[in-house]
Amino acid sequence: MKLTLDPNGWVVHVDQLDVLDVNSTERDQLRTLPYTNLLVVTHNTQPLTIDQYHQFTSGVFDNLNNDLPAKEKIFVEQTNKEIIRVTGKKDDHGEITGLFGMPDDLPWHCNEPGRTANERPDALCLYGVEHTEGSITGFTNSIQALKDLRQATDAPVGLLRSLDQLMCYYNYSGSTDNGPMAADVNYQGRTGFNKFVTQNKSGAQGIHWSPMQNPRFYIGKTPVPYAGQQAWFSYLYKFLTQPKYCYAHQWKDYEIIINCQWLSMHARPAFENIENRLLWRAMGYVSPFDGSAIDTGQLELRQ
């Protein structure tokens, strides 16, 4: 397995990995780098069966999540609800068979942001099954963004002094078929509070935020006044999605990405071929570890 560092300084690329025969050293790197560096892109070139992909994901996580409150149709059969279809493909009744099947934009978000740390999966793993070329998924780096945010001179009144006390409440329902705010809801997001500034399993500190699910800001148990809600949301959305904190992954079939779901968001620009594109998605958990000794800054830069 060969590791290279993206020119942006944080995304790790993986080449020359036999995903059907991952050794213990490779597995350890695939389990830790998505937390220290937030995104790992494996440029796999061999097609996988669902059993092979299921086996791969079971190896890079301690456990896989299987309790998403969604319709049966989105789960890949015989995977214990651990593998989900992400596609706009329709069945014989005209119903979309996977998550997020609309051709228009899928806004910046992370999955089920209101769930507690004990329940919520740490990371997602996506595999490009077919017809992915031309599709883009964007990812963010809130570790670096938080460092810069603390030094910002143009932040709205009260935001910076409240950062470490800030909580977000998510009370969200939305359709995984036809867009986040569609009326035909087939998925009920679970509600709850989470810290705005938090840590992932590696000990890295960053920002946990998901603007698609309409978060409400609280300081402790006190809601931020309406004017502050609006100003803070607008400022943070623009700040956290600046190009310097974003990576646009241009999909090719058979590639695999693993992305931290505590300190990173993802989004998908409009894609007209969504009815043919198919991704498989797994979400999982790892045990806490000390990521401070992991230094990818010495890796060769990817050309």
Give residue ranges: language-model regions.
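Non-heme Fe(II) oxygenase catalytic core, chiefly the N-lobe of the double-stranded beta-helix
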Residues: K2-L39, N44-D253, W262-Q303
